Structure formats: C-alpha cells, structure tokens
C-alpha cells in the first residue's frame, strides 16, 4: 500500500485552493463519490480492493457510485472503474453537530481491480505519531475558488503542514476535538467537494492516510487551517469493522 506505480510530482507550491494539477494516476487510492446523475460530491480513499474510507458528513448511500482510476472527470477516454456500494458503515460515534468522528466505510459490491492507476493507501497504527510541521499532501476535485460555480475536472493536489491541536485551537477554539487533526493555513486549503478525500503523509517510504477532509473555513481561506478526521484515533474502529464484515 501507499506506493503509487506512477510517482506523484509535487512542486512544493502546491484551495484545493492554490493547489496544482496532479500527475494522472499518481494518487491511485483517490476515488470520486458520485450520485446517480454522475455529479461528484465527495472524495474517498481505497484501503483495499473491497473498502473505501470517506467522511461521514458526505452522507453516502448505496445508490451512490465509487469511481476509481479517474483523473479528468471531463474525459470519456479514461479506464475508470464505476463500483457499486454494497453497504455503508457510518461510525456510530459520528456527531453531526460537532462533526467529530467524521468517518464512514463503504463496502463495495464489486471489488476494485488494482492496476497502475488503482491501488490502496496505507492505514496508520493507532500509536503512530505524525508530528506538527510534517509536510503532507491532500488531493481532490473540490472547488479551486470558493466562489466558483463548478468543481475542476482534473484532480488537484496541495502540499501542506500538519498543525498541533493546541495551535489549531488558536483558530478554531473548542470546535477542535481529539478525533480531529488540522493542516494548512499555509497558502493552500481544501474546499467544498474535497470532503472525504485523503490527507496523506509519507511514512517509511509509503503514503499513509493521516486525515480525511472534514471541515474548515466556509470561504476556504488559505490562512486558516483545514480540519480533518484524525485517522489514528479512528483506525481501531476501521479494523474492527473490516474484521466483522
């Protein structure tokens, strides 16, 4: 897991406001969640052939579709996989008022077929520590300006630093809970449409899922940290859910 066949290229300046276009296929765990009309509403990450992790607040249902292997949503020539969802497992501790424990697992009806452009991200251990200041990457098809009417066709990426929760509370106060992790305030920001997608950090040479795009500034301010579900705090629930299903 966590080692793309097609290597990502990060210029360093990388909403996803002020991000940049990704190399096609270089984030092979990134999926697009689309409703039955084909409208992209959230991102997600493949953690194996049968399971996708996303945000609970995305409100995914079994009538939605997981699209894997996609880069350009405006292209009809890509070898994408449209995968049906068998079951939605929303974390029972998810609180829609505080947006805490913002994680949902999707069990696929048909397994994804792994390839150069479709593969899994690594999950961290509950004990893993990703230090404040670590540069990580978030990806998605979310708005590139909060005022835009439409999301971009092509997958965007941005490098951004992790913050400590103590530091993050300077911006967000008591809204920041233990199952959240903040990143950004560095000239880039996740934005609407990125939700559910990955915040990944490299650990021992493999990209590891550290956060799930959750919430942030309503204007996708690049000087305010974005808030992500903290995967280390939720990974035990993930492993238990996979084991039981």
UniProtKB/Swiss-Prot annotation:
InterPro entries: Peptidase_S1_PA, Peptidase_S1_PA_chymotrypsin, Peptidase_S1A, Trypsin_dom, TRYPSIN_HIS, TRYPSIN_SER. The active site is at residues 57, 102, 195. It catalyses: Preferential cleavage: Tyr-|-Xaa, Trp-|-Xaa, Phe-|-Xaa, Leu-|-Xaa. Residues 16-243 form the Peptidase S1 domain. SUPFAM superfamilies: Trypsin-like serine proteases. The keyword Disulfide bond applies. Disulfide bonds join 1-122, 42-58, 136-201, 168-182, 191-220. It is found in: Secreted, Extracellular space. It holds the Pfam family Trypsin. Its EC number is 3.4.21.1. One of its GO terms (cellular component) is serine protease inhibitor complex. GO terms for biological process: digestion; proteolysis. Residues 14-15, 147-148 form a propeptide. GO terms for molecular function: serine-type endopeptidase activity; serpin family protein binding. Keywords: Digestion, Disulfide bond, Hydrolase, Protease, Secreted, Serine protease, Zymogen. Belongs to the peptidase S1 family. This is Chymotrypsinogen A. The lineage of its organism: Eukaryota, Metazoa, Chordata, Craniata, Vertebrata.
């Amino acid at each position: 897991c966590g080692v793309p066949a097609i290597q990502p290229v990060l210029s360093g300046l990388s909403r996803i406001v002020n991000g940049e276009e990704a190399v096609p296929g270089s984030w092979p765990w990134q999926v697009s969640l689309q409703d039955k009309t084909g409208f992209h509403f959230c991102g997600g990450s493949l953690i194996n052939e049968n399971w996708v992790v996303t945000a609970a607040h995305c409100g995914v249902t079994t009538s939605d579709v997981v699209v894997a292997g996609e880069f350009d949503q405006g292209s009809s020539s890509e070898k994408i996989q449209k995968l049906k969802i068998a079951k939605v497992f929303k974390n029972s501790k998810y609180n829609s008022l505080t947006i805490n424990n913002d994680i949902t697992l999707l069990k696929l009806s048909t397994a994804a077929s792994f390839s150069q452009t479709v593969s899994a991200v690594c999950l961290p251990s509950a004990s893993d520590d990703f230090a404040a200041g670590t540069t990580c990457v978030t990806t998605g098809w979310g708005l590139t300006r909060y005022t835009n009417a439409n999301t971009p066709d092509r997958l965007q990426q941005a490098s951004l630093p992790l913050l400590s929760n103590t530091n993050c509370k300077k911006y967000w106060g008591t809204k920041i809970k233990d199952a959240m992790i903040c990143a950004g305030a560095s000239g880039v920001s996740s934005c609407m449409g990125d939700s559910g997608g990955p915040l990944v950090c490299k650990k021992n040479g493999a990209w590891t899922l550290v956060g799930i795009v959750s919430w942030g500034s309503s204007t996708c301010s690049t000087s305010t940290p974005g808030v992500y579900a903290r995967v280390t705090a939720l990974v035990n629930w993930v492993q238990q859910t996979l084991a039981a299903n």
